[in-house]
Amino acid sequence: KGNALGSGLGGSAASAVAGIVAAAALVEEPLERTELLKFAMQGEAVASGSVHVDNIAPSLYGGLVLTVGIDNPFVKQIPVPDTIRCVLVHPHMVLPTREARAILSKSVPLSDVIWQQANLAGFLAGCFTSDLALIRESLLDVVIEPQRQVLIPGFAAVKQAALAAGALGASISGAGPTVFAWVDAADAEKVRIGMVDAFARHGLESDSWVSAFDRAGARVVGD
């Protein structure tokens, strides 16, 4: 699958989904995606130690998704404006998910919860209405990012480089250390180079990608 361990790219979820989709292709009776989702969740639980659907659902369904519930999760694909690209920059370091979780506070100030909820609502509204200005205003994590950024050398500079090059927003992918940015397609390469250069200035080589959103999801390709 090409996802490094401890990268913040959802490697365990991608493995679980790939295995389930491949196995399902061998049976005579096709399985519904809802059934595949539950099987993949069990694989993710074995790999990561807990049952959760946040990485499984987008790996299986494709694109940006909203999930609600665990036992019978509700999955809704969220439309993304056609011109949006995602820039991903993975510095050559490993950040174990356990370490990234351990640094998080057990309590969150009410003011931050309110701000985070407002940002989420604005972000979703921006996606549904293709309002790039609203996405830019709302693509901000005020709860997790401030706590985890200390684990990623140069994060502040990388984020600032992305924004200076025209990104709508940038933050930590998963538990890190990969950093992502949402950008208009016209600015994607400039943003990618800026982020890579910022990591390099802090002594970290990196791999980087510019990707559109694959709305088709996991599937068997070729023979």
Segments from the language model and where they lie:
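A short glycine/serine-rich beta->alpha loop
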Residues: 1-10, 44-51, 106-111
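DPxDG-like acidic metal-binding loop motif
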Residues: 11-33, 60-62
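Phosphate-handling active-site elements
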Residues: 23-39, 71-74, 188-194
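Short, well-structured alpha-helical segments that form the helix of a local strand-helix-strand
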Residues: 32-46, 133-140, 192-193
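Alpha/beta catalytic cores of group-transfer enzymes, especially the acyltransferase/condensing modules
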Residues: 33-83, 170-172, 180
